[in-house]
């Protein structure tokens, strides 16, 4: 009897359609419930929910009740959700994004991320996303790396207990700013199963040496969350689609061919002044790009104000 050769895990099967979402950090001037309703009415299938002052603030009273209400609203609207943790001035009214995992007082950031994990678990989030932070000038690189690994290990343990998937985002200008940096951190943590990568498509064009579709292919096996926006080489500025340098149909094709089933969420945090218009324009663009990539496109949006009605 011939012994069959050992098998290796198969690549995830390709998908025929992608699920588009939108970041609530691009709806900063809307109440959260209003933002969710607008996005569902437009035809989005999910949201990247940034925990912020007016959007499910994890430090305000009645968190459990508010999380439960949002979970029910998401279900009623048919929206998937990922939790984002990049709010500005949430932890410190004087310093944007401080403290990070690299600061002397990193405990405040760790506490926030543990709260985000609990919120993500209660919402049934597909992922909780976070980043390293910018290294403070007085902190040596090796000390910053040690702090990052230690802080991430604590968050990984919390996520593992809660059954939550983490998406770590390389961010230009931060200690971990590219895919190579994510790979280093993943190895340093012992390659935990719950620690995936959040890939911002614009960042790939901004600073990666590979093409954007190749970046997608490089991380396909670890990809748990996707942010999408246009960008130009060497400039970290989130742009509306069609105003940067990215050719999107090959990017969407690479996501589908890699078997990615998570949300592909528009990331335009500086466009809240025209949020509904920009969100509508963005979805039209993505649907057109998906068709050009040979992918199926979701049903057209229902008339405004009717989503979730009895």
Regions found by a protein language model. Give the residues of each.
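Structural motif corresponding to the early beta-alpha repeats
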Residues: 45, 51-146, 271
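Short helix-to-loop capping/linker segments positioned immediately adjacent to catalytic or ligand/cofactor-binding
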Residues: 143, 156, 171-173
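Histidine/acidic residue-rich metal-binding segments in metalloenzymes
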Residues: 151-157
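Active-site-proximal segments of metal-dependent phosphoesterases and phosphodiesterases across multiple
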Residues: 176
């Amino acid at each position: 009897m011939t012994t069959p050769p050992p098998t290796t895990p198969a690549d995830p099967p390709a998908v025929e359609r992608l699920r588009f979402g939108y970041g609530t950090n691009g709806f900063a001037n809307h109440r959260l419930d209003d933002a969710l309703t607008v996005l569902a009415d437009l035809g989005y299938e999910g949201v990247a929910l940034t925990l912020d002052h007016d959007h499910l603030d994890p430090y305000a009273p009645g968190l459990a009740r508010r999380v439960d209400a949002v979970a029910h609203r998401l279900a009623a609207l048919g929206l998937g959700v990922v939790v984002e943790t990049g709010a500005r001035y949430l932890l410190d009214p004087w310093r944007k994004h401080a403290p990070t995992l690299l600061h002397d007082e990193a405990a405040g950031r760790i506490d926030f991320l543990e709260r985000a994990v609990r919120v993500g678990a209660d919402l049934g989030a597909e992922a909780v996303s976070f980043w390293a932070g910018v290294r403070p000038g007085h902190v040596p690189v090796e000390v910053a790396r040690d702090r990052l690994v230690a802080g991430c290990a604590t968050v990984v343990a919390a996520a593992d207990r809660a059954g939550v998937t983490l998406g770590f985002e390389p961010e230009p200008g931060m200690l971990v700013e590219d895919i190579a940096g994510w790979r280093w951190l993943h190895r340093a943590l012992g390659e935990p199963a719950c620690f995936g990568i959040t890939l911002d498509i614009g960042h790939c064009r901004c600073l990666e040496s590979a093409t954007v579709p190749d970046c997608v292919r490089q991380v396909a096996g670890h990809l748990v969350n996707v942010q999408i926006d246009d960008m130009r080489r060497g400039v970290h500025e989130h742009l509306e689609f069609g105003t940067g340098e990215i050719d999107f149909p090959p990017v969407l094709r690479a996501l589908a061919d890699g078997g990615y089933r998570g949300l592909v969420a528009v990331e335009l945090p500086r466009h809240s002044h025209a949020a509904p218009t920009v969100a509508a324009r963005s979805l039209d663009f993505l649907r057109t790009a998906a068709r050009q990539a040979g992918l199926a496109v979701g049903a057209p949006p229902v008339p405004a104000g009717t989503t979730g009605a009895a």
